[in-house]
């Protein structure tokens, strides 16, 4: 099912010795043992729970759910992310060791869903908080779609160069350990906006309460971002 190919792993000699690179060997070991941290806040997470049963058996992909972010290399977000829960999500992502990956599952996680038009307390896309590797649309996505998303992530890992990923994340960081929110231009790229750096509380602009109600359209020029 959607076999993953390594171009450098098929060079064998007559003595059955495989020649490869350390990067490909590292990718192969990581994609075969993804340990997810399950971050479910709404009904989409119920569909992921179906994968634990014998019908879909997600253990065959090496997935071992963990309850600690320090033991996980994949965080799967499912459901609505509110402004109150956003700092907790960012903190969990920061505590995960490198390299780490994110799957956004469901319409509410990707765009805010039905709450994106008139809710002042909903994050309109989890990619405004953390970088997303795989988007899984649906309301809710079926278990088969979750398996397909995991397979696509494994393919991405197999073609990845570790040094390039670390460099890209270092150049696109906008969150800090104190997780303060402020008003700034919305981003839709899945990366951290370099211009939206956190300012100390002594110099940061005070956000009036009416700001939360002013910018509540689905596509607006300003969003609450981290």
UniProtKB/Swiss-Prot annotation:
The membrane-topology field of this record reads: Peripheral membrane protein
> Which cofactor(s) are needed, names only?
[4Fe-4S] cluster
Q: For this chain's UniProt record, which GO biological process terms are given?
A: photosynthesis, light reaction
Entries under Gene3D superfamilies matching the protein: 3.40.50.12280
Q: Which Pfam families match?
A: Oxidored_q6
Q: Report the co-factor binding details.
A: Binds 1 [4Fe-4S] cluster.
Reactions catalysed according to its record: a plastoquinone + NADH + (n+1) H(+)(in) = a plastoquinol + NAD(+) + n H(+)(out); a plastoquinone + NADPH + (n+1) H(+)(in) = a plastoquinol + NADP(+) + n H(+)(out)
Localization in the cell = Plastid, Chloroplast thylakoid membrane
Instruction: Classify the main location.
Output: plastid
Q: Which EC numbers characterise this protein's activity in its record?
A: 7.1.1.-
UniProt keywords, alphabetically: 4Fe-4S, Chloroplast, Iron, Iron-sulfur, Membrane, Metal-binding, NAD, NADP, Plastid, Plastoquinone, Quinone, Thylakoid, Translocase, Transport
Q: Which GO CC terms are listed, alphabetically?
A: chloroplast thylakoid membrane
Q: What's this chain's function?
A: NDH shuttles electrons from NAD(P)H:plastoquinone, via FMN and iron-sulfur (Fe-S) centers, to quinones in the photosynthetic chain and possibly in a chloroplast respiratory chain. The immediate electron acceptor for the enzyme in this species is believed to be plastoquinone. Couples the redox reaction to proton translocation, and thus conserves the redox energy in a proton gradient.
- Record note on quaternary structure: NDH is composed of at least 16 different subunits, 5 of which are encoded in the nucleus.
Q: Which HAMAP family match?
A: NDH1_NuoB (MF_01356)
**What is the protein's name according to its record?**
NAD(P)H-quinone oxidoreductase subunit K, chloroplastic
What is the native source organism of this protein? Cucumis sativus
Q: Which gene encodes it?
A: ndhK
């Amino acid at each position: 099912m959607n076999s993953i190919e390594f171009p450098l792993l098929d060079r064998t000699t007559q003595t059955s010795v495989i020649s490869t690179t350390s990067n490909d060997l590292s990718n192969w070991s990581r994609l075969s043992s993804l340990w997810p941290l399950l971050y479910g806040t709404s009904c989409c997470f119920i569909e992921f729970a179906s994968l634990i049963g014998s019908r879909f058996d997600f253990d065959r992909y090496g997935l071992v759910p963990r309850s600690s972010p320090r033991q996980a290399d994949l965080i799967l977000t499912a459901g609505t992310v509110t402004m109150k829960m956003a700092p907790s999500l960012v903190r969990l992502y920061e505590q995960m060791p490198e390299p780490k990956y994110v799957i956004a599952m469901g319409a509410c996680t990707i765009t805010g869903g039905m709450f994106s038009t008139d809710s002042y307390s909903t994050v309109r896309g989890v990619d405004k908080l953390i970088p997303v590797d795989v988007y899984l649309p649906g309301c809710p996505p079926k278990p088969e779609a979750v398996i397909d998303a995991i397979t696509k992530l494994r393919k991405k890992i197999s073609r990845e160069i570790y040094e390039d990923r670390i460099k890209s994340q270092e150049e696109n960081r906008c969150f800090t350990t104190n997780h303060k929110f402020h008003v700034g231009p919305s981003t839709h790229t899945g990366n951290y906006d370099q211009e939206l750096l956190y300012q100390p509380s002594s110099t940061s602009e005070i956000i009036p309460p009416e700001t939360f109600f002013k910018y509540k359209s689905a596509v607006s020029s300003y969003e609450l971002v981290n």
